């Protein structure tokens, strides 16, 4: 993309020159305490978006001099505004951290997007849980990833205002509004909160209501609140500021003048700029004309920054003139970067500013981070697509735990090439594409209809893996049933007394099936000591005068046997067996033993025991 192209659409961006960061407090020695980065997670419809909107809306309504700044993919709330919203719960004099930066990633269903240098991009997280629903699949998935990355978190027990009998007090801290409620409402809420704390315990976390927690490094604080009425939101902000100040202050000390480091949240085409990346910057700074290195689908991309963009205040996202240019972005901040050659940049990948460093070293740094999350692949396996690099890593971990091999794994929507690759798998179970939080391109849908490839998509990783495993289990059962239909099944039966209807050509006798399954067109044997003697072939079965193809244990039927004569080779009262080919006996014992009924297993065991008395290795 040329310089001319980058500036072609003058309506798309304001020429206002400003700088942006989420406010920062400089120390006397020049070090700066950056804003802690907060991720808000939760199951669909549990209120995470409403909570973010409430934080934004409340902060805007305060109309303070240090009012919030809307970043790309993030919302910065300065300490003064936090104090106004939290009231007496937050005294600015007690804090030297500059505020909070809430990451806002609509469309991103997984916290896995938010990674940096092998850990979590967020310094602290809020897990939003509907007190009425408790933990749901995405809640559990979020907790699992938070645990893996070692990210501290609090639980926002949302929708307390839906408690029967609750009378809301908008914007109030939770304890005063709780105390003002009728006892029945308090009791009902207590019950729900203790159930939620029990859910935490079930997932391996010790938790309690936040004001009862003495040590937040060992226990998870639960903050009851309502994103709709803002009750308890002051408490949440106070807890986030308090935890950040007490436990993370040293981690927040950075040099904001140094070369920037960040994580790509999203790759988007913007009119007048082409492909752009939305980035959360967690260290240093970035300026127009900086050379940057970003992670791409084919390796690191080296390019130069043409423009830094932030949303215009109160601008509708659909309007053309919706961005302001900024002259510098400093951590912590969310910023849109316009630069050439970003089409293959990956969401979740690292971004580094070169500036006064050796370019080759920075490229190696990005390569190393990409290699750190490279997915282990096999010669035979499934195709995996995910929305971000972090999601891909989490998918690969989940599939590895489930012993599912991966042939190919990439970031991006499902494309025709993915269907073509999956169709080359030798095993039917591997002719599969697993897509996490991705769309299917229309031409890929067409190819899918014409192929034998199966596609599974979901926004919850473990549900996606479980769905695939269920499919494989069904396939295996179907294959086993097919094998069982084709294989000779063990059966022991006895000729009934006074039930000889014809002596020979064929012999027709009444029998009782003692164990196993009797089927037509199978050879029949009689044991003489340890020696099996084939006496004929079963050519017909009748039950109550009707022809049938098989008879199970416990039934009495009449059968026709070609070959023997009653009174010579067989007698009334004789015990006879279906002859099992040795190969079939081996398959039944080694592969299908869990699939056959108990009586059939009994017949198989007896049959094998008889053979192995004369040949210990028969059927092995």
Swiss-Prot record:
GTP binds at residues 42-49, 104-108, 158-161. Residues 42-49 are annotated as: G1. Residues 11-29 have a biased composition (Low complexity). Residues 67-71 are annotated as: G2. One of its GO terms (cellular component) is cytoplasm. PROSITE patterns: G_TR_2. Residues 226-228 are annotated as: G5. NCBIfam families: aIF-2, PRK04004.1, small_GTP. PANTHER family: EUKARYOTIC TRANSLATION INITIATION FACTOR 5B, TRANSLATION INITIATION FACTOR IF-2-RELATED. This is Probable translation initiation factor IF-2. It comes from Haloquadratum walsbyi (strain DSM 16790 / HBSQ001).
């Amino acid at each position: 993309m040329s310089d001319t192209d980058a500036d072609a659409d003058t309506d798309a961006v304001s020429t206002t020159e400003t700088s942006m960061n989420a406010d920062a407090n400089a120390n006397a020695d020049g070090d700066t305490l950056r804003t802690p980065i907060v991720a808000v997670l939760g199951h669909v419809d549990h209120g995470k978006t409403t909570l973010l909107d409430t934080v934004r809306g409340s902060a805007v309504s305060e109309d303070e001099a240090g009012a919030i700044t809307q970043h790309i993919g993030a919302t910065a709330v300065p300490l003064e505004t936090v104090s106004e919203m939290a009231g007496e719960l937050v005294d600015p004099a007690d804090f030297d951290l500059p505020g909070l930066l809430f990451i806002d990633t609509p469309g991103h269903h997984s916290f896995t997007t938010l990674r940096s240098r092998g850990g979590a991009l967020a310094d602290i997280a809020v897990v939003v849980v509907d007190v009425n629903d408790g933990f749901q699949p995405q809640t559990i998935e979020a907790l699992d990833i938070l645990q893996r990355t070692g990210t501290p978190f609090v639980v926002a027990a949302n929708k307390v205002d839906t408690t029967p009998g609750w009378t809301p007090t908008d914007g109030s801290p939770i304890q005063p509004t709780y105390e003002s409620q009728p006892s029945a409402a308090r009791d009902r809420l207590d019950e729900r909160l203790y159930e939620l704390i029990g859910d935490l315990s079930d997932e391996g976390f010790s938790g309690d209501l936040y004001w009862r927690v003495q040590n937040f490094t060992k226990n998870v604080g639960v903050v009851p609140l309502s994103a709709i009425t803002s009750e308890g939101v002051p408490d949440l902000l106070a807890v986030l500021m308090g935890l950040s100040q007490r436990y993370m202050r040293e981690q927040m000390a950075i040099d904001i003048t140094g070369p920037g480091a960040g994580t790509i949240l999203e790759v988007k085409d913007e009119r007048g700029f082409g492909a752009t990346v939305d980035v959360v910057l967690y260290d240093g700074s970035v300026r127009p004309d900086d050379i940057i290195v970003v992670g791409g689908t084919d390796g690191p991309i080296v390019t130069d920054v043409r423009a830094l963009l932030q949303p215009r205040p109160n601008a509708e996202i659909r309007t053309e003139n919706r961005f302001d240019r900024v002259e510098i972005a400093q951590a912590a901040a969310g910023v849109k970067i316009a630069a050439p050659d970003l089409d293959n940049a990956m969401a979740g990948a690292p971004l580094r500013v070169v500036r006064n460093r050796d370019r080759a070293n920075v490229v190696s740094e990005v390569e190393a981070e990409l290699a750190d999350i490279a997915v282990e692949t096999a010669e035979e396996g499934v195709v995996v697509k995910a929305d971000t690099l972090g999601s891909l890593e989490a998918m690969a971990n989940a599939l590895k735990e489930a012993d599912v091999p991966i042939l190919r794994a990439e970031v991006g929507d499902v494309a025709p090439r993915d269907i073509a690759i999956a169709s080359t798998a030798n095993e039917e179970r591997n002719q599969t594409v697993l897509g996490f939080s991705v769309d299917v391109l229309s031409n890929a849908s067409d190819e899918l209809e014409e192929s034998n490839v199966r596609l599974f998509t979901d926004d919850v990783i473990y549900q996606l893996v479980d769905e695939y495993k269920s499919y494989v289990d069904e396939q295996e059962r179907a294959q086993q049933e097919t094998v069982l239909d084709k294989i000779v099944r063990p059966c022991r039966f006895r000729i009934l007394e006074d039930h000889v209807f014809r002596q020979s050509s064929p012999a027709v006798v009444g029998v009782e099936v003692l164990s196993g399954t009797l089927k037509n067109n199978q050879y029949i044997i009689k044991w003489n000591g340890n020696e099996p003697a084939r006496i004929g072939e079963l050519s017909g079965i009748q039950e109550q005068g009707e022809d049938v193809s098989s008879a199970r244990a416990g039934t009495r039927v009449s059968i026709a046997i070609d070959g023997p004569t009653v009174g010579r080779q067989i007698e009334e009262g004789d015990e006879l067996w279906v002859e099992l080919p040795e190969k079939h006996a081996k398959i039944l014992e080694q592969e299908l033993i869990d699939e056959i009924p108990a009586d059939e297993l009994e017949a198989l065991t007896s049959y094998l025991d008889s053979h192995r008395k004369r040949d210990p290795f028969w059927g092995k």
